[in-house]
């Protein structure tokens, strides 16, 4: 039996006050968005899912390739949720629509979930100069980091590892530490980049790969001391609930 409201509560997301949520960082962003959609559906919320980059498309999602307000509204009325995006022919992935057009859709839904970053399924990343693609109208930014990067070399666990290596001032073979994760999560040159005035959360995914939860707890506690709300867990394990 699935527990609804689990990730909404875990990340302390006030969807009534802050309904537009952009997700950035490492692998797990799409899974988190789909999980949040499930929880929001259970609460009877109308949800639009979209992306400002690329995002894996679930064929079970009702897809609207148009930003026509009437068409999107009809799909939301019928299904309660909709993916609004173009589809890339070669990859079959959802791809970005114009940001101004996306913004006009916000009044049609209760919550909008936007994947605003890419990581090629790597658990860790430091954004390039042109990243992340957080829309100006987003209320919340959630950064995702996979805890399976801990203790492993930067070159194996980071998307565009050279950016992470340069940012941390470590060589590519250096193992990722808890302190590295904290630095990446809180720096304006890391995953806090372009957050500005928005509400910010950090989700540490894949806690199930750890032998014990103390490293995750330590990171969450340290981030809290810096004023950042963070949580850890496992999207894979959550699917079994």
Question: What are the language-model segments listed below?
Answer:
Residues 91-98, 106, 117-225:
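Conserved catalytic-core segment of NTP-binding enzymes
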Residues 23, 48-51, 83-86, 112-116, ...:
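General beta-strand structural signal in soluble alpha/beta enzymes
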Residues 4-43:
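Walker A (P-loop) phosphate-binding motif
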Residues 37-92:
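N-terminal phosphate/diphosphate-binding loop that engages ATP/GTP or pyrophosphate donors
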Residues 27, 52-54, 117-118, 207, ...:
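Short, ordered loop/turn segments at secondary-structure junctions
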Residues 42-47, 107-111, 195-196, 221-233:
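Structural alpha-beta junctions
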